[in-house]
Amino acid sequence: MLDERARTLLKTLVEHYVADGQPVGSRALSKFSGLDLSPATIRNVMADLEEAGFVASPHTSAGRIPTARGYRLFVDSLLTVQPLEARQMGEMEEALHGRPAGQIIASASQLLSSLTHFAGVVIAPRRQSSRIRQIEFLSLSEKRILLIIVTADGDVQNRIVTTDKVYSPAELVSAANYLTQNFAGLDFEQIRHRLTVEIKQLRDDIKPLMALALDAGDAAMAENTTPYVISGERNLLDVEELSSNMKRLRELFDLFEQRSSLMRLLEISNSAEGVQIFIGGESGIATLDECSVIAAPYTVDGQVVGSVGVIGPTRMAYERVIPIVDITARLLSSALSYKSDN
């Protein structure tokens, strides 16, 4: 446990290093910390902080810089978050509200990027959870059927399925009516769960068609999904700590393109409350060892459906980025919930 003197010096060091990117020496700490300490005492305290893993000494400088552990202590117990100005919040709200539903996710990603000058990312609501209004089957040939799905928000998805047997038009109408009458208002996951309970009530010849319809419906909805939108990746080219290592920078852009690892990280915030902060190696992704990820969940009608985040260097103004991510998540929730009600 650090004493108050050490905590004050660490806070001062982090703030100054974030501001100008240069290692912080004892003279600057003496000037800006507000502590009446001799240079020798400050050097001793800094040596203790370095031994404890909170700061490090670059080989080319007598000053020190924060480590990931130092940033973590700073964020957890030393940080004073700066509330956003009313004017800026108004501009953020205007950027998201009043747009077509399909543009809101992309706008949120661009908003995060433009405000932080890092990469902004949004995991979109999964379309598989769209509620179903109507399902129809249309025979194309003996064993090829067109599945037509109409969602509650008016989207229409089509999928061709191949069956093992020939279904008559009457059987297709019967199966479609059964699904529509019994499962309208549910998503495919809920329908699948209900059918596992009610499967005994179905005729044996209809059961395979129901299974095909569910699988095809899931696939059709997934294909029309853009689950991940990222903006401002090029901003990271201007971050000296990242751009100085081209190999690591290429790996970072590969991570953005592959998506799956980053999506899994961001989805962790879906099950947590408020803003989640991953500093350096805390992400569990080696490519992000020199980065921080700030993420928060957003909701539609009170249900968590995705997350927003900012990816940047560990040297970032956390007191500013954290509220930007938090407010963006809240405004996105409001904008999407409004769309779902209209």
Swiss-Prot record:
Key words, A-Z: Repressor, Stress response, Transcription, Transcription regulation
Domain of life of the native organism: Bacteria
GO terms classed as biological process: negative regulation of DNA-templated transcription
InterPro entries, per database record: GAF-like_dom_sf, HrcA, HrcA_C, WH-like_DNA-bd_sf, WH_DNA-bd_sf, WHTH_HrcA_DNA-bd, WHTH_transcript_rep_HrcA_IDD
Molecular functions (GO terms): DNA binding
Coiled coil: none
Entry's family note: Belongs to the HrcA family.
NCBIfam families the record matches: hrcA
PANTHER family: HEAT-INDUCIBLE TRANSCRIPTION REPRESSOR HRCA
Functional summary from the UniProt entry: Negative regulator of class I heat shock genes (grpE-dnaK-dnaJ and groELS operons). Prevents heat-shock induction of these operons.
The name this protein goes by in its record: Heat-inducible transcription repressor HrcA
Organism this protein belongs to: Dechloromonas aromatica (strain RCB)
The gene coding this protein: hrcA
